[in-house]
Each structure stands twice: as C-alpha cells, then as structure tokens.
Amino acid sequence: MAARLYCQLDPSRDVLCLRPVGAESRGRPLSGPLGTLSSPSPSAVPADHGAHLSLRGLPVCAFSSAGPCALRFTSARCMETTVNAHQILPKVLHKRTLGLPAMSTTDLEAYFKDSVFKDWEELGEEIRLKVFVLGGCRHKLVCAPAPCNFFTSA
C-alpha cells in the first residue's frame, strides 16, 4: 500500500518537502502555493526519524522538520509520465540548476501532483523506485546513468 503524503516545493531551498498525511493535525502550519500545510512538531517526529511508520523508500531526511532533500517513491508504469514520455523533469531541473528560466515552482508542484502522485496513489502500481533530487544534502543519491544526473533508480 502506498504512503499518502503532502508534497510542497520550498523555493528558498529548491527542495521538495513531504509530509505524511497523518501529520496534518499536528505541528505548526506551513504556508505555500498549495495552501496551508502542516509540518510535524518535534514530538511528532520520533528520534528514529519515523522508521516505524513504514513509509517505504523515503530517505531519512523525509522526517526532518525541514522536509527531505531527495524524494524516493514508487511510481506507476516505470516512470513513463516523468522520464520516458517527454523528458520534462530532467530538463526542468537542469535549467533550474543552471539558473535559467524554467518551470515555475507552482507549476512544478502541480506537475508532481498531477503526473506523479496521481499515478502512484490512484493506480497503486509498484514497478520501480526512483529518486528525484531537487536540492542537496548528505542524504541525496546521485548515481544515475548518463545523460541525466537528476534521477536514479534504486
């Protein structure tokens, strides 16, 4: 069964922040383009970084109050909506890395919501794991085959 998560991009750090749906009633609200979201309070984030929650495949930083720096999740149809169809996400992330005009933060949030999480949650198919790296910290995984360094199979 797929974990249900809130998804929000933090434009100041250029990272994708995730929150387990069960945490919406805890912690302080976090305002953003998608409305008001909740971030877990310190008491809602256990010392083991949520290992007991069985949110399969999420990096350790997914449970930090700042949100994760990399997102690993199970997606449908071998990621055809994000990788194979039009190569949209790698191009967008590459442009953002170079500081060039690219998809806006709001559009990128909608892209994840509509193209990725819709397939993942509604279809429930579990074929491959992918990691999307929008920012950087010691948890990120960048070992993708050429030509794209913005995602990797796990």
UniProtKB/Swiss-Prot annotation:
Annotated S-S bridges: none
Modification note: A fraction may be phosphorylated in insect cells and HepG2 cells, a human hepatoblastoma cell line. Phosphorylated in vitro by host protein kinase C or mitogen-activated protein kinase. N-acetylated in insect cells.
Region ranges (Mitochondrial targeting sequence): 68-117
Keywords: Activation of host NF-kappa-B by virus, Activator, Apoptosis, Host cytoplasm, Host G2/M cell cycle arrest by virus, Host mitochondrion, Host nucleus, Host-virus interaction, Modulation of host cell cycle by virus, Transcription, Transcription regulation
Pfam family membership, one: X
Location(s), subcellular: Host cytoplasm; Host nucleus; Host mitochondrion
GO biological process: DNA-templated transcription; symbiont-mediated activation of host NF-kappaB cascade; symbiont-mediated arrest of host cell cycle during G2/M transition; viral genome replication
Function noted in UniProt: Multifunctional protein that plays a role in silencing host antiviral defenses and promoting viral transcription. Does not seem to be essential for HBV infection. May be directly involved in development of cirrhosis and liver cancer (hepatocellular carcinoma). Most of cytosolic activities involve modulation of cytosolic calcium. The effect on apoptosis is controversial depending on the cell types in which the studies have been conducted. May induce apoptosis by localizing in mitochondria and causing loss of mitochondrial membrane potential.
Quaternary data: May form homodimer. May interact with host CEBPA, CFLAR, CREB1, DDB1, E4F1, HBXIP, HSPD1/HSP60, NFKBIA, POLR2E and SMAD4. Interacts with host SMC5-SMC6 complex and induces its degradation. Interacts with host TRPC4AP; leading to prevent ubiquitination of TRPC4AP. Interacts with host PLSCR1; this interaction promotes ubiquitination and degradation of HBx and impairs HBx-mediated cell proliferation.
Recorded family membership: Belongs to the orthohepadnavirus protein X family.
Protein's recorded name: Protein X
Gene designation: X
